[in-house]
């Protein structure tokens, strides 16, 4: 196993980010009341996703204040994974970088929904990342969850 600075950080960062996105997907659609709209929106080829869930169990998907909104988005833009609390569109302004483009290059970020008749959908997050200092060091990470609330 390589111990160079490009290998372990990219591996742990990739897996950690994939797990974080997957946990948000697992919550998608939860509502302790009557919420309107879709709990999960997968855009494009799955390189952008917007998730809604009733985080405070007040029966609605809150949009305000933005810092406490029940929406969160993740997208791949210019080889960087970004996130935005309160996202309503993949084109919104103000997205924050989740990965450092000076250290990690994200080649692939994709969310895939697999619907199975009679069951909750399976949601899979796939990511491929490379160390900027060691581009030959590539890490593939994937994590699947069940969308029980969708």
Model region roles, listed by residue range:
Residues 95, 100-101, 108-150:
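Short linear sequence signals and composition-biased patches located at protein termini or domain-edge surfaces
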Residues 1-27:
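Aliphatic-rich helix starts adjacent to a transmembrane/signal segment
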Residues 35-116:
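Type IV pilin-like appendage domain
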Residues 31, 80-84, 137-142:
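Secretory-pathway extracellular proteins and peptide precursors enriched for disulfide-bonded cysteines
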Residues 27-36:
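Short, well-structured beta-strand/strand-turn elements
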Residues 12-13, 66, 137:
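Generic detector of ordered secondary-structure context
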């Amino acid at each position: 196993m390589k111990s160079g600075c490009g290998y372990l950080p990219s591996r742990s960062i990739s897996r950690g980010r994939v797990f974080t996105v997957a946990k948000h997907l697992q919550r998608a659609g939860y509502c302790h009341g009557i919420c309107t709209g879709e709990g999960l929106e997968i855009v494009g080829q799955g390189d952008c996703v917007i998730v809604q869930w009733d985080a405070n169990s007040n029966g609605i998907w809150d949009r305000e204040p933005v810092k406490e909104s029940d929406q969160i988005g993740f997208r791949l833009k210019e080889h960087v994974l970004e996130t935005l609390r309160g996202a309503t569109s993949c084109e919104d302004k103000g997205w924050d970088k989740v990965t450092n483009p000076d250290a990690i290059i994200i080649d692939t970020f994709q969310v895939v929904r697999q619907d199975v008749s009679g069951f909750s959908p399976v949601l899979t997050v796939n990511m491929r990342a490379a160390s900027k200092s060691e581009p030959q060091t590539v890490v593939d990470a994937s994590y699947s969850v069940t969308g029980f609330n969708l």
